[in-house]
């Protein structure tokens, strides 16, 4: 967030105050120009309840305006087991009473290897969720159910990253060709994987 001004490389009062000022300026701009728009702060701490709690306590103490919702990133490779996500959702929705989304997540649908994989199979694997189309669908269902169960009426939804990267020719993100191929929700010929269907059912 506009480094170095908004950097929290050190958790000091003045750093939280600086970041709060930046975020509040953004909130005011949205409220003034598009008052019907909803504002979400996106944190990458979906697997770290303690860090999430500390972030909010310090930011609200520094005068941060409450947003309309919070988005959390959750990837098993970096965030650990799903129970970590559950704990963090409880912090956001329970302790702070904020609507919450899993704003970024993914899980491989194949154990095949990529030239430059974003999700490392060895570090991403969760017990009970195979690297297969059905395993990916089970993961999507589980994440949706966890969000709904923990956050209840404060659950916003689940966003997948990256939905449309079906083959090496089309995957053009900066991490390299095919980096996200096996976390896609579509097949190489553009058909929906079971996980996309699962997410659709969960949203109803």
Predicted segment positions?
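Aromatic-lined glycan-binding groove of carbohydrate-active enzymes
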Residues: 64-69, 81-82, 88-117
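Active-site beta-loop-alpha junctions enriched in small/polar residues
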Residues: 1, 42-47, 72-77, 105-108, ...
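Short, surface-exposed loop/turn motifs that are enriched in glycine and acidic residues
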Residues: 74-79, 129-133
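Active-site cleft segment of glycoside hydrolase catalytic domains centered on the general acid/base Glu
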Residues: 1-61, 65, 79-91, 95, ...
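Structural preference for beta-strand elements that scaffold enzyme active sites
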Residues: 36-40, 66-71, 99-102, 155-159
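Aromatic-rich peripheral "rim/lid" segments of glycoside hydrolase catalytic domains that contact
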Residues: 4-14, 87, 91-94, 110-204
């Amino acid at each position: 967030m506009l480094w170095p001004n908004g950097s929290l490389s050190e958790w000091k009062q003045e750093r939280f105050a600086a970041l709060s000022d930046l975020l509040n300026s953004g909130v005011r701009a949205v409220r003034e120009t598009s008052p019907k728009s909803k504002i979400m702060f996106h944190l990458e701490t979906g697997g770290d309840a303690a860090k999430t709690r500390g972030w909010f306590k310090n930011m609200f103490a520094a005068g941060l305006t409450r947003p309309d919702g919070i988005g959390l990133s959750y990837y098993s490779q970096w965030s650990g087991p799903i129970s970590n996500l559950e704990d963090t959702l409880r912090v956001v929705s329970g302790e702070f009473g904020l609507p919450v989304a899993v704003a970024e997540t993914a899980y491989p649908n194949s154990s095949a290897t990529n030239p430059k994989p974003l999700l490392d199979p060895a570090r991403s694997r969760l017990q009970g969720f195979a690297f297969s189309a059905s395993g990916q669908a089970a993961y999507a269902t589980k994440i949706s159910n966890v969000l709904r169960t923990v956050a209840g009426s404060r659950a916003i939804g689940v966003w997948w990253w990256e939905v449309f990267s079906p083959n090496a020719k089309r995957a053009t993100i900066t991490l390299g060709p095919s980096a996200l191929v096996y976390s896609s929700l579509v097949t190489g010929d553009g058909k929906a994987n079971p996980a996309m269907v699962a997410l659709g059912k969960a949203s109803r």
